[in-house]
């Protein structure tokens, strides 16, 4: 939160962490039901413009199928950004036709104090194409990025 306060002092971007983000359940960030409920709550909240995954999403594959049927039209309008195991949820959203899904930096990466956090914020705010992989700007084909281990698990190789 300090990075956001220091770098966006006008408050034009506000970051809200769901209380479940700080949960503990074994090596997971909370039990599956709590994590699924938190994701659905924020995805369906019309006051929020985007969902930016906080960390790697370890265990997101365990909740991905449970959350999809609970997402509303509000959730479909949001932008979603994350990487690593969060790719399980990103893949599910992409497959379901959610138009604004990207594999990229997480909010926890902002502490690196480099351009990646700014590119992520600009994409989350407006879909700014300068934040994309450069080849995507001229290639009209759909493109999806994944952690290779997650992609391997998703396709079953």
Predicted regions and their residues:
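ATP/NTP phosphate-donor binding region
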Residues: 1-47
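Short active-site oxyanion
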Residues: 48-50, 76-80, 140
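N-terminal glycine-rich "phosphate-gripper" loop used for MgATP/nucleotide binding
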Residues: 52-61, 83
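Short, well-ordered alpha-helical microsegments
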Residues: 59-61, 89-90, 152
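Short acidic, glycine/serine/threonine-rich loops at helix termini
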Residues: 63-64, 92-95, 113-115
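Short, acidic/small-residue loops that bind anionic groups at enzyme active sites
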Residues: 68-92, 100-106
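Conserved anion/nucleotide-ligand pocket segment
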Residues: 98-156
